[in-house]
Every structure is written in structure tokens, then in C-alpha cells.
Amino acid sequence: MEHLDVGPLKAARGTVKLPGSKSISNRVLLLAALAEGETVVRDLLDSDDTRVMLAALDTLGVRCEPLGTANAYRVTGTGGRFPAKSADLFMGNAGTAIRPLTAALALQGGEYTLHGVPRMHERPIGDLVDGLRQVGARIDYTGNEGFPPLAIRAASIRIDAPIRVRGDVSSQFLTALLMALPLVEGSGRPVTIEVVGELISKPYIEITLNLMARFGVQVERNGWASFSVPTGVAYRAPGEIFVEGDASSASYFLAAGALGGGPVRVEGVGMSSIQGDVRFADALNRMGANVMAGDNWIEVRGVERDDGKLHALELDCNHIPDAAMTLAVAALFADGTTTLTNIGSWRVKETDRLTAMATELRKLGAAVEEGTDYIRVTPPSHWTAPAGGIDTYDDHRMAMAFSLAAFGPVPVRINDPRCVAKTFPEYFTAFGGIAA
């Protein structure tokens, strides 16, 4: 197996220009494809997941033309109706692609199949399918019930009651419905989505609502319990849109700035960000890091304690589910036990991240308690360098988060480092540029 040996690292300093946000990139691509008019998308993330979305849109007949400048595309909108009325779509392991596309395709009146890598066929999609079936969508499971692959058939869509969808497994189900429902033919009469259970990852819904508004569709919400979505309205191309830097990816460099003394600055995301994971900086500050920020940048200059340790903390991570993985590894360097709660969504990501995180932290000597939706980490009393290395489970965020363990007293071997291509292909080059 390919591996990368990192550390032990003693210092971190420098500036990193972040790649575009995955969550924003794939939402913007789909909205631009569904809109009336042309959208120039700039600073689009170049990664496995965005390539999956671009390939799917191409198969569906959407023109996405790369421009001369880096990571810029001109997307010619379809006015809500894809030219291709039948297609077989490979979705890799891109949840941000398969879920919103499933909803949009269910309303197209065509015949489509969606499938992916084996892990994708283990990631639940039943709550979204149940929601779409409430309006008459015809979607069949061709493998295990509740999971991809999916077969979508032409259907007569009708909305005569509120749509109910669970919110406690993945916010992407709600995002998919929100983005698709304006495509339903109608007079603009709104349809109500009712959320069953507690909605997790609320900041990702904020991203969805913000971007829908940029494309001319306003959604009204009643707290987080229900949403009123207009139907029969057209998305309108905004002309040009810039993709923010990825706030989840920023977390690794900010943590490095704390553990390695800094200063480390990330550019492309800051206090004006629409991404919830930007609040990772607040959590890092609570752990004792020296954090400064502007509208489009965040900088960390070491920690306030002379011994370089972080403060242990207990934190509800509903608002930073991806960046919370960085906190779990940073907890190796705390002065006590850190508890991260409300992270049940980790179990349905690229891997079961709760079990994976607990397993790999223990390899380094940490004492770890893994619960249904929480993890409790006590730093090692004696660090160990696992002979077999840190396994990454084909999960980009496992690989990136555990690079921070190299600030400990032992070298760290990262297995399958190329899995970072899902969102940040050049991560280890960028990390090596600021850490030594």
C-alpha cells in the first residue's frame, strides 16, 4: 500500500490559498445547470467529487465549458429541464452530487440510473427517496432497500400536502428537496417541507438557502422545523459567482498554526463566510489558540500556554461536523479529556468516521471512548508510532486530520495518502509547505 511518512514536526508557519469549498462547488454547479442563462463559476474546487458532478451534468446534456483561467467554468443553464431524458450516471462516492441530483432527476420526467463505488452503496438515501415518493416520484432501489443504486422513472408529480423528511441522519436530504422543488410545475404556490426530528448540520442548510437566493429563489423557514419553497419558479443565472475557499480544509492549517507555533494564515475564507465550518476557529480559540481573522482570511499564532498545550473542552459539534474531525486529532495535544458530541452524522460519511477515528487515535496511544454520537479523547501518556501506519479508509478527511498527529513526538505514517484527491488533491504539498 502506498504511504507517506510525516514528522515529527516542530513548527508551522506560512500562508495557504485554500481550494474551493466542495459543498458550495457542487451546489453551484447544479443550480447553474438548472438556471435560465449562463453562469461563470470561478474558483471551483478541482477534485474527484466536482469531476463527478461535471461528468454527470455533461451526460445530462448540460454545457459546462472550462475557461482559460484556473478553475473557472461557463455553465449554460437548461431552464430547469435537462436535455437528456435517459442516462446512466456514475456518482463515485460523492454525496454532494448523488443526493441533489436524485431529487432533480426525479422531477424531470425521464429514465435515469445512479450508482457509485461500493461505499456509496452503503450510504443511506432512503429518507430522501421517501420524501420524493410523497409527491409521486417513481424511484426504485436496484440493490439494498434504502441505499443506492437507484432507478428513476418518469412520473406524474403532484403536491397536495406538506412533505415530511427526516433531519437527523443527513442534512443533504433536505438540501436536495429544497433545491429541486422549485422545478415542480405550478403557479408559484409554495410547498411546505416539514423536518422530522432534530435537524443536524444546520449550517449546510444555510449554505443551500444562501445559494438558492443567489440564483433568485427565496425560501422561507420557520425556525428549523419547516420550510416554505416556491414552485413553478425559475432559477436565474447570477452572471458570475465565486466559490469560497473550503472552511473544512482550512481547519487543518489553522490547527497546525496552533500546534506548530504559527503564524499560519489561510486565505479564501474568513468571518464573512457562509460556511458553518468557519466556526472551527472559535473552537480552536476556546482551546487556547491565538486566532485572528478578517473577511477573507484567518490566522493562528500558536497557543496562549507556555507549555504549548491546548485546553481540553466539551463541545456540541452539530455546527461543524466535518471540522470536528480536526478537533478530535488536536485533542491529542490537550491538557485533559476532550468530548465532542452530536457527531452521529460521522457514521454515514465516506466511512464510519466515529469508529475509524477511535481506532486510529488508539494506535497513537490515546484513550478513546466511542459513543453512538460522541467521542471522548484522552491524550496519550506515552505516544506510540503504529508499525502499520494510520489507516485512512479511503476517506480524505481521515488522511488530512491525522497529518496533524505528526506534531507529536513520533513520526506518523499515513496510508493511502492519495485519497485526499476527493476534495484537496494537493493537500500534502500545501501542508509540507507550512510545516517542518
From Swiss-Prot:
Record: residues binding 3-phosphoshikimate: 22-23, 27, 170-172, 201, 322, 349
Active site, renumbered: 322
Protein's cellular compartments: Cytoplasm
Gene Ontology biological process terms, A to Z: amino acid biosynthetic process; aromatic amino acid family biosynthetic process; chorismate biosynthetic process
UniProt family annotation: Belongs to the EPSP synthase family.
Physiological role: Catalyzes the transfer of the enolpyruvyl moiety of phosphoenolpyruvate (PEP) to the 5-hydroxyl of shikimate-3-phosphate (S3P) to produce enolpyruvyl shikimate-3-phosphate and inorganic phosphate.
Subunit structure comment from the entry: Monomer.
Name under which the protein is recorded: 3-phosphoshikimate 1-carboxyvinyltransferase
Gene: aroA
